[in-house]
Design a protein with these regions (language model features):
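Terminal targeting/low-complexity segments that flank the catalytic cores of oxidoreductases
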Residues: 1-149, 153, 180, 199, ...
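Short helix-capping and inter-helix turn/linker motifs at the boundaries of alpha-helical repeat units
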Residues: 114, 192-193, 207
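Alpha-helical transition-metal enzyme core signature, strongest for iron centers
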Residues: 127-135, 156-174, 202-213, 235-246, ...
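Long, hydrophobic, well-ordered secondary-structure blocks that form the structural core
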Residues: 134-196
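Aromatic-anchored, glycine/proline-accented short structural segments
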Residues: 215-276
């Protein structure tokens, strides 16, 4: 469509009608509706924008006002924030929102033996802490995404909503059946010292959420009713998106900024070391949470030995799935430099 002709009206200035942006895009909505990927075309698309434009709040494809003040809050290099899956994951997140109030069959929760109830409350107390920090951290980086790469910011917004819902649903589970919150540990407070987008993605998305997702996917093993099964199933669905964003961002970093390899290894060296040394750093090394998981997996405190055997299976799965993601990213050499505690849980490489 041609730009509208300038309309002259005495006393008014309609210079803004002299459009200097690209026009003429016509799109038919598809089976999934009108998606971000559909409009990712012409000068409005992200292709070819490896470096962001001027540091002003002008959205991609729009002409910036020459008077716009500059700022220094945003990442300029696309590789610092980009994920090739950001658009798809954002659309999926919008389509798969759920409500902890309406979509969980809370009526299926019946009184449980004290050891089982308190074990579940212990686990869910820990998870409320984990999810609070997992929602807090992305918010610190949202404003640093340049408008030319806004899809990454949109995805982080959906993650904050997801983590808020997880905190909400695990807190409700603590309080709904005669139990309550238990003594709080430190949680994943080490993540709050993160100072870079890619560092956040490596430690939160790849590492932390990857390990938590493995636990959520084992929800059938530790759940006592349909409500708990659905909680873990829906939470795992959300975590899969966060994890996918992290893996595809880090892969993009390795593809476009290969000189950052040792930087990424350094982040993971620190996190693997922390998980192996700090009892509050993770689900599998926190004694209180580990014992609660063993009680749930075994079916009671009198079957805790059986539960610990199942817990070891989960630990091995966590580490091996973590290693697989590293290989997808392009960090397969991490197998040789992984901490000994982790390396001992790795499956041997097929000959």
């Amino acid at each position: 469509m041609a730009a509208p002709a300038l309309v002259e009206v005495p006393g008014a200035n309609f210079d803004w009608l002299n459009l200097d942006t690209e026009q003429g895009m016509r799109i038919q909505a598809g089976r999934r509706g009108l998606t971000l990927d559909d409009i990712n075309q012409m000068s409005y698309g992200v292709q070819g924008r490896d470096e962001a434009g001027t540091n002003v709040f002008s959205m991609r494809g729009a002409k910036a006002d020459a008077r716009s003040p500059r700022h220094a809050r945003q990442y300029h290099d696309k590789g610092d924030v980009w994920s090739e899956s950001a658009m798809l994951l954002y659309e999926e997140a919008n389509q798969r929102q759920w409500s902890s109030a309406r979509d969980i069959p809370w009526e299926t929760i019946k009184p449980l033996p004290d050891d089982i109830e308190w074990a579940m409350c212990t686990l869910c107390t820990f998870l409320t802490q984990v999810e609070f920090i997992a929602g807090d951290l992305p918010g610190r980086f949202m404003e640093q995404v340049h408008p030319d790469h806004f899809e990454a910011q949109l995805f982080l917004g959906t993650q904050i909503m997801d983590e808020s819902r997880h905190l909400d649903v695990f807190r409700k589970r603590c309080l709904v059946n005669g139990g309550g919150m238990v003594d709080a540990g430190f949680g994943a407070i080490g993540l709050l010292s993160v100072d870079d987008f890619t560092e956040m993605t490596a430690l939160l998305h790849l590492f932390g959420e990857g390990f938590v997702q493995t636990l959520f996917r084992m929800g059938e093993l530790i759940s006592q009713n349909d409500a708990e099964k659905k909680i873990f199933r829906l939470a795992a669905q959300d975590e899969s998106r966060h994890l996918a964003f992290g893996v595809t961002h880090l892969k993009y970093v390795m593809d476009t900024q290969p000189w950052r390899r040792e930087e990424l290894h350094h982040y993971l060296d620190l996190q693997e070391g922390t998980l192996g040394q700090n009892q509050q750093a993770g689900l599998t090394t926190n004694p209180m949470t580990g014992e609660a998981l063993a009680i749930l997996a075994g079916g009671g405190i009198n079957k805790i030995d059986e539960g610990f055997q199942k817990l070891m299976i989960m630990r091995k799965r966590q580490v091996n799935e973590y290693m697989h993601r590293l290989e997808v990213i392009g960090l397969g050499d991490r197998r040789d430099r992984m901490g000994e505690g982790f390396k001992a849980l790795l499956d041997p490489i097929d000959a």
